[in-house]
Each structure stands twice: as C-alpha cells, then as structure tokens.
Amino acid sequence: VKHAFIFAACGFAGLTACGDDPKTGANDVDATEEVAPEITPDVTLEEVEVDEEVARPTGPRANVYPVAPGVSPALVQVELKHLNEPNDTMTGAFAHVQSCSADLDRGKRSKLTFGPTTVEIVSCVPEQKVKPGADGTYLHIVPPATPAEDDGRFAEVMMYHHMQVIHDYFKDVYGLTERDHPLEALTNVATWIDRCETWAGVTNAAFVPALGLAFFVEGLDVTSLRGDAIIFSGTAERNFSFDASVIYHEYTHAMVGATRLSGTFVDNQGLNSLPGALNEAYADYFSATQTGEPTIGVYALTDLAASDFCGVTDDTAATENYARDLRAVRRCPDDLVSEVHSDSEIFSSALWAIREEFGARQADTIVLYAALELTDTSDFNAASDLTIQGANDLYGADVSAKVEAIFAARNLIGCDRIMPIDKVGSRDFELRVEGTRVFDPNPYPGYVPGYLQYGVVVPPGTKRAKITLDASAGGFASNGQPLEVDAVVKRGAEPVFYTYGLGAGSATNDGDYTFTIVDKAFVIQNPNNVPLAPGAWTFALHNKARRTLRISAITATFE
C-alpha cells in the first residue's frame, strides 16, 4: 500500500454472460440470473447479507468490521465461507491465514550489516492461533482494545473473511478462477531489533509472489508460506489487517496484477514505470468498488505516526496521511512523480468517475474487461484506449463516448511524460532518475534517462536561459557529491525520442543539444547572441552516475 516495507474468468465473452447484456444499460439484467447486490457508498456487501434473513450466516460464524474501525465501527456477524473441515484454523479452499507472534525464544535470528554497523534481528513466528469455541463458532473472538493488544486472532479472522469476499466477487460475478487455491496471508508481521530493544512493525502491506519471498525481507521467517502471499504489518496504533480496503487492495494485486503490469520498461520516451502505477490503480479501484468507500486506507493510512529504523517514534505530533481518495481529480503529466502509488491516483480517479457515471456493476465490468487485456508494457495511453474500446464493445457508442470524455478530462489519452518545470515538487515528492547500476547490460551508452522529461516555455526575445536543479546525487548518505548529469534539450513541445538498436549502449536520441550540468545548472544560449526560439522547449536528464539522482525543484531564469 505505502512504500515503507522493503517492498509493490468468464473470459471477455463470459463477462457479458455473468449478468450484463453488452448493449443495454446497467439496470437491464435478465431477471432469471443471480445478480450480486449493487454496492453503493452507503451499503456494503456484508450489510446486504446481514439485513436479508435468507442470507444470514448458517456455517461457522464470526464478528468482523465490514470495512474498518472508524469507517464501519459496528461489528457484523458473518459466515466464514469455504473453511476446510473441521474448521479449526483459518484455512480454506482459497486462503491459508497465519498471524506472526512476537517470540524471542522461537523467532529466527539473523544479522544485517549497514556499512560499518551490524544489527541482530529476530523474526516473529508465523502460526495459526484461531480456534472455534465450544459452540463451533468464532464469535468469542473480538477486536482488541488497541492494536497493540492484538494477539493475532482477530487479525486472522478479518483477513480470512475479507479474502473470501473479494475472491467470491471476482469468481461469482466474473468467473475468474486464477485464485481457486489457498493464497497465503500473514498478519501482524514485526521484527525485534537488538539496538532498539523492541518489536518493530511497519506501516505497510504487500502482495509478494512466491519467487520473491526469499528476497522480500532479510530475516523474516517465510518458511511456512507455500506460495504467493499477502503480508501485513502495522503498529501499536494501526493494524493493517483490520482494514478491509487494504485486504481487497492486496488481493486484487494477486488476482489481476500478478501476471501483468509489473516492473518498468524502456520506450521511446525513456524509462516507463506506468505499468506499476496501473497495477496500483486497479488494486485501489476494485477495493473501493467493493467497500463503496472511495478512499483507500481511511483507517490504515490516516494519521500515521512518524517512524524510523526502530518503528514508531515518540513524536506523536508528526503524523502523515497516505490514504488515497479516488475522487481527487489529477492530470497527466502535471501530477506524475514517478512513484507508482502516487501516479496511480491519476488513472484511478478516472476509473472512479466511470463508476459514478454508470454505477458499480457496469463500471466494474468495463474496467475489468480492459484490465485483463493489459501487459507488462501497458501504460496510461494503452489502458485508456482499451477501456474506451471495452465500453464500446460491451455497452455501445454512447457509453464509450462518456468514458472517453472522462479520460480526456485528465489528459490520459496520448499523454506525453513531459512535466512543466513549475510542477516539479508540487506534490512534495522528489523525482528520481535511476543510476546506471539498475541496468546490466545497459541499453543506453553510459547513462540512464528519467521516467519523466521536463518542459519550459521560453519568452520572446530571450538570448540566454539558465535551468537550475535543486537536486542531490545518491540520496541517503550522499555527502554532497557532485552531479554526473547531462541535459538533452529539444526545441518544441515534443518529447526527446529514444531509438534502440541491438546490444548494450545502442540507444540514440533526437535531442538538438546536449549540455553537461555544472553546479546543478546548465545554460541554453545561441552563438552570436541570437535570440532563442520562443515557446515550448523540452529537456531530458541523463544520469551518468551509479546512484540515483533526486530532484526537488527545477527553476528557469531568462535574459
């Protein structure tokens, strides 16, 4: 969800066969078909089930929050579906849930080295704690007074139940069976750090593919995890497993994003991280449409206390909010920051607007139809085009036109990744240009371009333009080392385009000028004091150092 852990069918024809006529409105449904209840901001799926007598739990029962403490503070009674017989742990056909116990005697011990410093850490111990009561239910398990007092049992119950809710949504409504096997889930993750003398959790959760578990967190005991996993931590104030919106988000990564929309690729504008942003956008959207709440992490990601190496600090006044509100309209490229969670808000705001326009059922169908066609090299342009086409295929030209207008309002159709320099830093994020160590072999000759390029408007009569970067090389412990950066400048509003040949170092670009940045600045000036062409200019930054370049602001002065 947030980036603090050491972390990120029916088939298309069958989408229409699961309750939606491809050329009718959202409410035109065959009365003989079983239709899932419409989920609105005021009605959750659990509330629909509890309010209808025929849907009351008949199997193993438990108390859960429909969404999260403070969002839906009253507990509801639910059936824990798909549990294996004899129902003695949170293991079923589609989930294997454990919580992680803080136990210094049984925890796995290891050492981590950071330069001259070595610390010893002890992993928490994964185990299943939930057991049914004498009546065969789990109603005796209730939320702890505070997350700090949680023994793992309520976290396991919350996790298990909401995994079934989102699994059954994808399967029963849309026929997706990719997760028809037990997905691993681990709650309450924390580690003991000897220099801190405390158990430290983090404000995060993550979906981790099976192949990535060994590299996920050094020292974490993952031996009991038998495949892909969703892993949740938290603090004494926030247990991320208590927030259904976070569970749905991570489960959607497992369902929709596990085989597509991962990583970064190179294209004709440099490095493109937007597949990861789309992965986050779809995870946010399907979480929000399931809860009916357009903000992801109202409980888990709001008023988070400041943290450091040892966990939450004593500075209770230093809190931050990372909840993502899908109603907040953002635009490409002005709001891009080359961080996938933040960049995702541009696209997810469009998806939520589609839901507001057409309702949950019709919008979900349009959105999923497109998402299942995407690949690891799909970006905002591709996803917008596929969603518009999907709306046309499923519901006709009028619906498609409205979807296109929603994307156009956010400049998501044909958006070049050129950020106006006055927007750099506007979202309080440092922009990154990766170092050469990220590529081996490197397709670029001795440099790495950024995820973004930058636009500047030169006034008429300008003879000299000076571009200054507020930037640092290397980030943590950089010690003020000088930048090793070139600026490739191009006249006009088009991006600098890259072309790739065969082998390492074969990339070329169509920039007009290349300047070496000295003292964090470069100057554009014609010979003989000839004025520069007025209007839009574009430049790309090429990092020639091994470590990351971080940019807080870019300014321009004209003479």
Model regions and ranges:
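Enzyme catalytic cores with a strong preference for nitrogen-chemistry domains
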Residues: 453
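Short secondary-structure subsegments characteristic of cysteine-rich extracellular domains
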Residues: 9, 365-367, 511-513
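Solvent-exposed serine/threonine-rich low-complexity stretches and specific carbohydrate-binding patches
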Residues: 498-514
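Zymogen propeptides/activation segments of proteases
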Residues: 18-247, 254-449, 464-466, 471-482, ...
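Sec-dependent N-terminal signal peptides
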Residues: 1-22
